[in-house]
Amino acid sequence: LTYLFLEAADGAQTTQPAISFRYNKKIDRETFRRALKLTQKGLGQPAFFNDDINIPRVLANGCNDIREARDYAIEGCVEAQVPGKTDFRPVAGFINILKVLELTMFNGVDPKTGRQFGPKTGTMEEMDTMEKFMDAYKAQLSYIIDYHLKAYGICSALHSQICPTVFASTLVDGCIEKGRILQKDGAKYSSTGTFISGVANAADSLAAIDQVVFRQKLLTLPELVEILANNYEGHEEWHQMLLN
């Protein structure tokens, strides 16, 4: 049956619907080679998922039955879930970790609004090592994640009242037995995902700070913050150096 799906996908030559291919050490080699051949067409089909990684992941995510974990399927983009028994919500929100870096550099203050949005993790004058700066960044990130979770909890509670998923709840195990809809923990399992944005930009920025401030000592952190606060006005040479 797997081989037939791969043949059909090869014949259709479309990027949707997305096909997931579960891989394990006992997989039939001919079928695996057929999946690889389809991948060579450049359509991004199929997506490969390793059972040795995903089964333990499902168990760690709350599943307490190894048989159900072995029966996992892919929902959303790459999330392994127990089909028919999970309330999976693919997008709980976004966290911009580059913005978190900006909050770190301004001691928790959002420079755009002037509001004290994050915790006070220390002024730049106090950050005399990259380790101290990273500790402050991690503290800001931890606070923002907690803030995000609280906001998501409020939104989820409101959704259960304003837009209850009654019909969908009849299709997922646990809801009828408990007399609860999905949004009120009716399903046997529940999980969601949060998108992290700005990862590459934040990594590049941290690398630039480490190199220019702490390794080469070309600028101090207070000087860098001052330059950033003025959007590099009169300091284009620093702009180019930090970019490169």
Q: What is each stretch, according to the model?
A:
Residues 1-244:
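Conserved catalytic cores of very large enzyme subunits
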